[in-house]
Amino acid sequence: LTGNIGRPGVGVNPLRGQNNVQGSCDMGSFPHELPGYRHVKIDAVRTVFEDMWGVKIDNEPGLRIPNMLDAAVEGSFKGLYCQGEDILQSDPDTKHVAAGLAAMDCVIVHDLFLNETANYAHVFLPGSTFLEKDGTFTNAERRINRVRKVMAPRNGYADWEVTQLFANAMGANWTYT
């Protein structure tokens, strides 16, 4: 249309809907894909990750957020641990999100701010600021950027440590450091 495809220094740069969606999807946060956009239904792909991670991976994809909310309204999805995202504000159908959150038995919000989703929380956990985190983010150009913390988390735990504590309390054996 504008002649900006196929030439050096130009191209398509689709913007994603939320911060670091690119990086989290690259790492396998989609319910139907493992890291590197490898589909969970492919036996050979699952085997690679099962061997690497030492766990069995279900070949059925998990639910996406809208499907989780549908299932909550229907009564089959009972709880949500929402970390670092205000789904009530980021989803285009706020009434759908509110109905789903209200129908759940347990909503845990782990965030830096008491956001709109936190209004539905049974438990709110304080999150860490960017100053308290080590990690990476991927920008819209797919450049990976390193982040280094400048201070320890004031709440005592890094966000990933809270996730690990929850997982271990539910029977996992996560020993990340």
Q: Predicted regions: what is each one?
A:
Residues L1-R7, L15-T177:
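Non-catalytic alpha/beta scaffold blocks inside enzyme catalytic domains
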